[in-house]
Design a protein with these regions (language model features):
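Acidic/His metal-coordination segments adjacent to aromatic residues that form catalytic metal sites
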Residues: 42-69, 124-141, 315-324
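Acidic, glycine-anchored loop motifs typical of Ca2+
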Residues: 118-124
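Active-site lining segments of carbohydrate-active enzymes
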Residues: 25-71, 87-113, 157, 214
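Periplasmic/luminal catalytic loop of GT-C fold multi-pass membrane glycosyltransferases
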Residues: 76
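Active-site core of glycosidic bond-cleaving carbohydrate-active enzymes
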Residues: 1-25, 97, 101-108, 135, ...
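Short amphipathic coiled-coil heptad-repeat segments
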Residues: 179-184
Length: 345
C-alpha cells in the first residue's frame, strides 16, 4: 500500500484502504474480560471467540470486505501506519473524515488489548513481519509502543484539522513517549531494549532486534542523538554479512535481523524488508552514506545476485537455513519504495 502514492496511484491506494476498512469489526463489543488465552495452544494465542478483547470492535480481519474471519495476527498496526502515511502524502482531509472512525476504533482496540494496565507501553502480538516466533508475555515492547505513539500523535494532529477533540490522543502520545524514554531506553548503552518483562524482576531484554531500532526511529520517538546512538548499536551488535561478487565496484553488506541464537525462523533471518527498513532508519538518523550502502547491498543481494533477477524477494541467499524464499513479497516492495523516496531522495 505504501507504493501506490509514490507512483501516483492514490485512487488505487484508497481502494486498498477502503477494502480493509470494510473488514473492521464494528458490531461485536468486548464482553469477555482479560485474560482470554487459548489453553489448547499453551496460552500463546487468544482464544478464537467473538467478544474477547482481541476479537471485538476495532479488529481488522484478514480478507477484504469480510468482518467474520478470526485470525491470530494483529495486522491493524501495519494497516493504520500505511493509512496515516497516505493521509500525510495526499493531504486529503475529506478522506481523513471518512476514515476517522476506522482510526479511532483501532486505537481503542490497541489500548484495550495491549495496554490494559494503562502504563503507556504496549505488548506486541503478531504485529510485524518477524512476529511468528516472537512472544513477550504481556511485556512492554518497543516496536509496538512506537507504532502506537506515532498513530496517536498523528491522530491528534488530524483531529485538530477536522474539528475533532485532539486531547485524548495528545495525552496518550505523550504518555507513550515518556514511558519509552524512562523504561525502555538504555542510557548507558544508547539504544532501546527489545522489551521489559512483565513478571518477576521486570528485566530488560537488552539485545534488541533490527525492528526495535528502525520502528522507534521511523515512528519519531527518538531525538537526533538517540537515533544516531541506536544506529551505532546496529553497527556494533548486529551481525554484518559481506555481499560480494565478481565485477562489483566495492564490498557491500547485509544484516541479520538479530544476534540471537540458536537459529529460529523469523527472529534471526536475513530478510530484505528488515534490511531496507534499517537502511531507511539510517537515512532518518542522518547517516545517509551508511544507509545507501545497506540499500545497495540489499538490492545487489536480491535483485542482481539472486536466482530471480529484478525480483523483490523475502529472504536472502545468505540466510543460513531458508536461503532464497518467496517472490514478489509485499513487505519488501513497500518498504523499499519508502527507502528510495524518503531515504535516498
Amino acid at each position: 500500500a505504501y507504493i501506490g502514492d509514490f507512483i501516483g496511484w492514490h485512487d488505487r491506494a484508497r481502494t486498498h484502504f477502503d477494502s480493509y476498512a470494510a473488514s473492521q469489526v464494528t458490531d461485536v463489543p468486548a464482553t469477555i474480560p482479560h485474560p482470554t488465552q487459548d489453553t489448547a495452544l499453551h496460552l500463546a494465542r487468544s482464544v478464537k471467540k467473538w467478544g474477547t478483547p482481541h476479537y471485538s470492535n476495532g479488529y481488522i480481519c484478514r480478507t477484504p470486505y469480510r468482518k467474520d474471519q478470526m485470525h491470530h495476527y494483529d495486522m491493524n498496526l501495519c494497516y493504520i501506519d500505511e493509512l496515516l502515511w497516505h493521509f500525510n502524502w495526499t493531504g486529503d482531509l475529506d478522506y481523513v473524515r471518512k476514515m476517522w472512525l476506522v482510526l479511532t476504533s483501532h486505537l481503542a482496540w490497541e489500548k484495550l488489548n495491549y495496554d490494559p494496565d494503562n502504563d503507556g507501553l504496549y505488548d506486541a502480538y503478531c504485529c510485524i513481519w518477524a512476529s511468528d516466533a516472537l512472544y513477550y508475555n504481556s511485556g512492554a515492547v518497543t516496536h509496538s509502543s512506537a507504532y502506537n505513539y506515532r498513530a496517536n500523535k498523528l491522530a491528534a494532529m488530524l483531529a485538530e484539522k477536522i474539528g475533532e477533540d485532539a486531547t485524548p490522543y495528545e495525552k496518550e502520545a505523550d504518555k507513550i513517549l515518556k514511558a519509552m524514554n524512562e523504561r525502555l531506553w538504555i542510557k548507558d548503552k544508547g539504544h532501546w531494549a527489545e522489551f521489559q518483562d512483565f513478571m518477576g524482576h521486570k528485566r530488560l531484554h537488552e539485545s534488541a532486534g533490527l525492528w526495535t531500532i528502525y520502528h522507534a526511529i521511523d515512528s519519531e520517538t527518538a531525538d537526533p542523538f538517540q537515533a544516531y546512538q541506536a544506529t551505532r548499536y546496529v553497527d556494533t551488535s548486529i551481525p554484518h554479512i559481506p555481499v560480494f561478487a565478481d565485477g562489483l565496484d566495492r564490498d557491500y553488506e547485509t544484516l541479520s535481523t538479530t544476534n540471537w541464537m540458536p537459529y529460529v525462523w523469523s527472529v534471526n533471518n536475513v530478510a530484505f524488508a528488515e534490511v531496507m527498513h534499517t537502511a531507511l532508519a539510517f537515512f532518518q538518523a542522518g547517516r545517509g552514506d551508511d544507509g545507501f550502502n545497506l540499500l545497495k547491498g540489499s538490492i545487489l543481494d536480491g535483485m542482481y545476485l539472486g536466482k530471480s533477477p529484478g525480483n523483490f524477494g523475502q529472504i536472502s541467499l545468505y540466510d543460513a537455513v531458508r536461503r532464497e524464499t518467496y517472490r514478489d513479497f509485499a513487505d519488501q516492495i513497500g518498504i523499499t519504495s519508502r527507502t528510495l523516496i524518503q531515504g535516498l531522495y
